[in-house]
């Protein structure tokens, strides 16, 4: 099985390190990867938000499993992109949908979600430059 890991941080290195130990893994690709991932995977150059490039890489390298580490491509909808494309929909992708990614990508969305479902969290309120005086009072 060929695996693609998106990202360049410590999280992605840890994922690659773990999956490199599996006998089910034929080849690992990292986009863009880092110096540590280079020892375990083939680093590829490219932008983690260039979904068309990631599609080409996935098809060319017969990717079966795809991990997404960074928040940015998740919030930008990489899971939804893969699942809506007939050529990519059968690739297993480890990432939340764009909507679910908002829990990590938007603190305002996450706080509203927690309040709506009675999940314990610190008090919050959203402010803008127009209501800065309210922000001072809130604090």
PLM regions and their residue ranges:
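Active-site nucleotide/adenylate-binding loops and adjacent lid/helix of ATP-dependent enzymes
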Residues: 4-5, 103-139
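ATP-binding N-terminal substructure of ATP-dependent carboxylate-amine bond-forming enzymes
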Residues: 1-99
């Amino acid at each position: 099985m060929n695996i693609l890991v998106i990202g360049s941080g410590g999280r992605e290195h840890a994922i690659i390190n773990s999956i490199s130990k599996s006998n089910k893994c034929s080849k690992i690709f990292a986009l863009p990867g880092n110096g540590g991932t280079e020892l375990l995977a083939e680093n590829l150059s490219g932008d983690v938000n260039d979904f068309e490039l990631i599609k080409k890489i996935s098809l060319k390298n017969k990717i079966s499993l795809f991990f997404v580490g960074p928040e940015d491509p998740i919030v930008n909808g990489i899971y939804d992109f893969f699942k809506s494309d007939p050529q990519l929909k059968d690739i297993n992708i480890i990432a939340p949908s764009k909507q679910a990614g908002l829990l990590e990508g938007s603190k305002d969305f996450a706080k509203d979600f927690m309040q709506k479902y009675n999940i314990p969290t610190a008090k919050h309120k959203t402010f803008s430059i127009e209501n800065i005086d309210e922000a001072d009072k809130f604090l």
